A protein has these predicted regions:
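Crotonase-fold acyl-CoA enzyme core
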Residues: 169
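Short, conserved phosphate/pyrophosphate- and ester-handling motifs at nucleotide-, phospho-/glycolipid
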Residues: 191
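Conserved C-terminal helix/linker of AAA+ ATPases
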Residues: 199-212
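Active/ligand-binding-proximal structured segments within catalytic/core domains
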Residues: 194
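P-loop/Walker A NTP-binding region and its immediately flanking N-terminal helices
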Residues: 1-166, 178-186, 197-200
Length: 212
């Protein structure tokens, strides 16, 4: 089975990640240099690289895989998940300096669940760091905003977006017409993940076919 392009071309280092401005790059690098992070809230539209940046941070900080818990809150968002799964994880001794809980799509967690999460973050602040990602920061309760450092990731310029997709197609030896590529960009921008997935599905024979 072929590897998904979204995973194959996912940046794994700070140098490989496309930052929208140098201020954010320097901020991320400073956390890595310090060897620690605050609780973080990464916001931005779907497919702009929130989870990728979170994983780059975790990897660059050298966090042990047994000290990392990743939860997709669009599927696991109950109060029980917060109180049981997360609490059981952060409540045990870490192998390294601290544990990291990555909560993807935290805006799917109910207000009651978010309130429970706030309590866990406070109780285990010395042993765990939390990285939350969301598409809609207005759905995150104020108490969590106040406990996390906000980090909004802007969408990439459409020209850069198109160039990145084109480069993947070239690297994969896929023939494509610029007008066909543009139709995929128009249908998916700024969601890079969605565009890559659609292009991969539509180029199994080595040529990018027009979307239906």
């Amino acid at each position: 089975m072929k590897q998904l392009w979204t995973e194959k071309y996912r940046p794994s280092t700070v140098d490989g990640y496309v930052f929208r401005d140098d201020v954010q790059r320097k901020q991320v690098q400073s956390w890595i240099d310090d060897g620690t992070i605050p609780h973080l809230l990464f916001s931005g539209s779907a497919g702009v690289g929130k989870t990728t940046l979170a994983k780059i941070l975790i990897n660059s900080l050298g966090v042990n895989k047994f000290d990392t818990l990743e939860i997709n809150a669009s599927r696991e968002n109950s109060v029980d998940t917060i109180r049981d799964k997360i609490t059981n994880f952060v409540g045990t001794m870490s192998f390294g300096e601290f544990k990291v809980v990555l909560l993807d799509e935290a805006d799917y967690i109910s207000p009651n669940g978010q309130a429970a999460l706030r309590g866990v973050m406070e109780t285990y602040a010395s042993n765990a760091r939390f990285i939350l990602t969301c598409n809609y920061p207005n759905k995150i309760i104020p108490a969590l905003h106040s406990r996390c450092q906000g980090f909004h990731i802007e969408k990439v310029d459409k020209t850069d977006f198109t160039s990145r997709i084109a480069q993947v197609l070239i690297d994969e030896n896929v023939e494509f017409d610029l007008d066909v590529l543009d139709s995929y960009v128009k249908a998916t921008y700024p969601d890079l993940r969605k565009c890559l997935n659609m292009c991969q599905m539509s180029s199994s024979d080595g040529t990018l076919t027009a979307p239906n």
